[in-house]
Amino acid sequence: MEATTKKMAMIEIGKGWAASCLEARTCVISNEEDIYAEPRADTPVLKLDSTVRTALPPGYGIVISGTARNHKTAWEIVPGLVDSGYTGLLGLLLVPTDETPATGSAGGGIVSFSRGGVHARLTVIKLVPDDIMGACGAGAQRLPLKTAITSFKGDEDLLGNGFDHCMESLASIYPDILHVQLDCPVYFGCTGCKAFYRRLGSCLETRPLNELGSDHIYLRRGSAYESVNRFAAPDDVMFVAMYGKWLLIGMAETPNEKLTVELRDDDSSPAALIPFHDTFGQKEAEDAGYDIRAPENCTLPPGGSVRVILRQKLHMGKGRAAFVMGRSSMNLKGVLVEPERVVDDEWVSFNITNIRDAAAFFRKNDRIAQLVALEDKLELMGGVDALPWRVVQSVQEEKKNSSRGDKGFGSSGV
């Protein structure tokens, strides 16, 4: 149990390591003795074990970054994410910066680092609460949809055989939608929709909530058309989007009763085209990141890179930022994700690079990256730590009730 009710980041510093700048809340750990690591033949990534442990209250995490140098090579510490409940020894993953990464193995023999050769920044971050991320479409505005039992050709409100009038709009919703004319009800591209509903933006009326009717679409006073990207609805509503003059709604099934889609005009909350947890996995209270799964099978040749695009957009709002980071288990194998900030209202995307000599393969739904959402901070690494530090004798004694414990070596999902 913590000795104080004030939220603090705890750190236990073992033999051969030191921590500096704790009072300034810019914690850096470094080696006070010569340290050694044994390279692996199948990856150029070097795993370096420290004797440092940390623990945080739920709702916080640590981003590890930094550099290292020995008499032969300059190294970069692969950015890693530490869960609040992890109490094991922190591990550092290093990649050489002055060599061509695709050369493959780190070579034979033991790699040594002299005293002071390793500097790792431990940046404490505050996380966006899970209930905000998970309910990123809930709101006060309502969009009544007409009852639509069948598909109507050329109807102004329901896109049936006449959906070609909105082909340009529909094609803009996701990069790989098929540019062909289909009859509803059928599945259209990757949206998983059988029915589409549309209304001209010029037909949208602005009224107070207490004057909402059942035959029109309303926008709350002061809201903008862009707010339709923030919505909550029954599961069969796959997306709500504004493109040009059209408001577009895609449904997995043709509705047999009146539906209600709630729209949000509060840009301080995240927004999504589909439910957040349909793309990002559920996480435990002590987890820092949300799992990102591969949308399809992929093989990366040695030195190869691929841009992964998810069928998801976010709007984090003021004072918040979301980043895609790699998973330590993949980083260790030499399959790296360069940390990248998610751009509001654009498709969530990121690069994966294989720096090994051998090809890398991942299957659809494999966990390949993670999303971390920051509160009151727009930069992933550096800056002032979100919590003050407290040096303790034993992190594991202070954090006895942690469900994560010492599983893994410090980064989420190992």
UniProtKB/Swiss-Prot annotation:
Protein name in UniProt: Deoxyuridine 5'-triphosphate nucleotidohydrolase
The family database entries (SUPFAM superfamilies) matched by this protein are listed as:
dUTPase-like
> Carries keyword Magnesium?
yes
Q: Which UniProt keywords apply?
A: Hydrolase, Magnesium, Metal-binding, Nucleotide metabolism
One MF term from GO for this chain?
Answer: dUTP diphosphatase activity
Q: What class of enzyme is it?
A: hydrolase
The UniProt similarity line reads: Belongs to the dUTPase family.
What does the function comment of this entry state? Involved in nucleotide metabolism: produces dUMP, the immediate precursor of thymidine nucleotides and decreases the intracellular concentration of dUTP to avoid uracil incorporation into viral DNA.
> Has keyword Magnesium?
yes
Q: What is its EC number?
A: 3.6.1.23
This protein's superkingdom?
Viruses
For biological process, the GO terms are: dUTP metabolic process
Q: Which organism is it from?
A: Psittacid herpesvirus 1 (isolate Amazon parrot/-/97-0001/1997) (PsHV-1)
Write out the residues that bind substrate: 327-329, 409-410
Name any cofactors this protein relies on.
Mg(2+)
Instruction: Give the catalytic activity.
Output: dUTP + H2O = dUMP + diphosphate + H(+)
A Pfam family per the record? dUTPase
